[in-house]
From Swiss-Prot:
One of its GO terms (biological process) is cyanate metabolic process. This is Cyanate hydratase. The active site is at R104, E107, S130. SMART domains: Cyanate_lyase. It comes from the Eukaryota. It holds the Pfam family Cyanate_lyase.
Amino acid sequence: MADQTKIATLDSTLIDRLPTSSKTLFEAKATKALTFESIANELGRSEVAVAALFYGQSQASAADIEKLSQILDVPQSKLEAELGGFPDRGRAGPMPPVEPLIYRLYEIVQNYGYAYKAVMNEKFGDGIMSAISFSTKVEKETDEQGNNWAVITLRGKWLPFSRF
């Protein structure tokens, strides 16, 4: 079982690649010793969506900003200034990734990407899975032997290519 006192913090090597809001949010999260799950429960969002917000990869609503201000004890005006714009997605880390867990996810796409594509094309036709009309979640499973397994669900709207 994971130690519940451990929380994810901001890797200092990423700070220059992330918006200023990331530093603000992560520092407040660490000060309060909050998990993404606990923040997500307060916001009514998934923990992955909240983590993406902290990394500047998703947009905060006015309600998110108000609740984050309360949860993290950060002035609402500061969060409005830092989170009020549009996210600059996809620039958080180097490509290919060097962080081992992120590299494993990249490796999954490298190894199974064409297999996923072939199966999805057979099931849905010619098109793509949206990463905009999209949701994801991470769950923990424990098997009969006590081994922990990570279960990542990716759910994206199917978008058929247009014929023109």
